[in-house]
UniProtKB/Swiss-Prot annotation:
Catalyzes the phosphorylation of the position 2 hydroxy group of 4-diphosphocytidyl-2C-methyl-D-erythritol. It catalyses: 4-CDP-2-C-methyl-D-erythritol + ATP = 4-CDP-2-C-methyl-D-erythritol 2-phosphate + ADP + H(+). Pathway: Isoprenoid biosynthesis; isopentenyl diphosphate biosynthesis via DXP pathway; isopentenyl diphosphate from 1-deoxy-D-xylulose 5-phosphate: step 3/6. It is an enzyme of class 2 (transferase). This is 4-diphosphocytidyl-2-C-methyl-D-erythritol kinase. One of its GO terms (molecular function) is 4-(cytidine 5'-diphospho)-2-C-methyl-D-erythritol kinase activity. The keyword Nucleotide-binding applies. It comes from the Bacteria. Keywords: ATP-binding, Isoprene biosynthesis, Kinase, Nucleotide-binding, Transferase. Pfam families: GHMP_kinases_C (PF08544), GHMP_kinases_N (PF00288). ATP binds at residues 99-109. One of its GO terms (biological process) is isopentenyl diphosphate biosynthetic process, methylerythritol 4-phosphate pathway. The active site is at residues 13, 141.
Length: 286
């Protein structure tokens, strides 16, 4: 039995567009978006424990272990393992490379990687669909990272269809603020009635398609986001990902990204990333 899985990637995502099309009776917003995986993310390391403990060995500022999605994901899967008569534990270390509150799905991706890795190590044998159902209990973005490939998302973000996206490089700016998602979705300024689109609409247009309905609200509340968008728009179709704060712009060639990256004002952290088609750990689930 394999007892360790090291260097497990938890890739970030970008929302190529994000439309808010309505609101459910329970308060959840109805969304349409294309989720794009990129080759930058956090890295996690897992070791099996025999005492049933779930232990996060990495200290994360502002994130107590008990509320960390990684620990919650492990405990959720552990509950499934116990139904099979197993009481496995795990040591989990996290190399955090993505910012908190960045709109890159970092915490959700970490949770998905945890479910994929521990499902393999603990030999719980859950299918991809079963893992996605567990993931939805943790957050609306988690199922996407378990889905395993770029997706057109609807509902609260959990209804997913595979979609082909352009081969792109991205320049991503971290404006230096952390955006509380709930603050954006609860804003009275938020547009909640964007006309629904079809996956074929995106597939035909792709580049510069749609917008991010959350961007206006976030940019008004957090001026550094507005500043980053304005600066990056000199070079192309810059927009915010998720509920912010990160801002990105697509480029066709790596050399184009490098040229712009060299000119980013020093007050911002910026980096480049390549679009990828599949989650690096997609092979762990069927």
């Amino acid at each position: 039995m394999v007892r360790t899985l090291n260097n497990c990637p938890a890739p970030a995502k970008l929302n190529l567009f994000l439309h808010v099309t309505g609101r459910r009776a329970d308060g959840y917003h109805l969304l349409q978006s294309v989720f794009q995986l990129i080759d930058r993310g956090d890295v996690l390391h897992f070791s099996v424990r025999d005492d049933g403990l779930i232990h996060r060995s990495t200290e994360l500022a502002g994130v107590p272990a008990d509320s960390d999605l990684v620990v919650r994901a492990a405990r959720l899967l552990q509950t499934e393992a116990k139904k099979q008569g197993k009481t496995p534990g795990a040591d989990i270390a996290i190399e955090k490379k993505l910012p908190m509150g960045g709109g890159l799905g970092g915490g959700s991706s970490d949770a998905a990687t945890t479910l994929l890795a521990l499902n393999h190590l603990w030999q719980t044998g859950l299918t991809r669909a079963e893992l996605m159902a567990l993931g939805l209990q943790l957050g609306a973005d988690v199922p996407f990272f378990l889905f395993g490939q770029n997706a057109f998302a609807e509902g609260i973000g959990e209804a997913l269809m595979a979609v082909k996206t352009p081969e792109s490089w991205f320049l991503v700016i971290e404006p230096g603020v952390s955006v509380p998602t709930q603050q954006i979705f609860s804003s009275l300024e938020l547009t909640r009635d964007t006309k629904p689109v079809k996956i074929s609409d995106f597939s035909r247009a792709q580049e510069s398609f749609g917008k991010n309905d959350l961007q206006v609200v976030a940019a008004n509340l957090f001026p550094p986001i507005a500043d980053a968008i304005k600066w990056l728009q000199q070079f192309g179709d810059a927009r915010m990902t998720g509920s912010g704060a990160c801002v990105f712009c697509p480029f066709k060639e790596e050399q184009q990204v490098d040229a712009v990256l060299a000119t980013v004002p020093q007050q911002w952290k910026a980096w480049k990333a390549k679009a990828i088609t599949h989650h690096p750990l997609a092979y762990l689930a069927t």
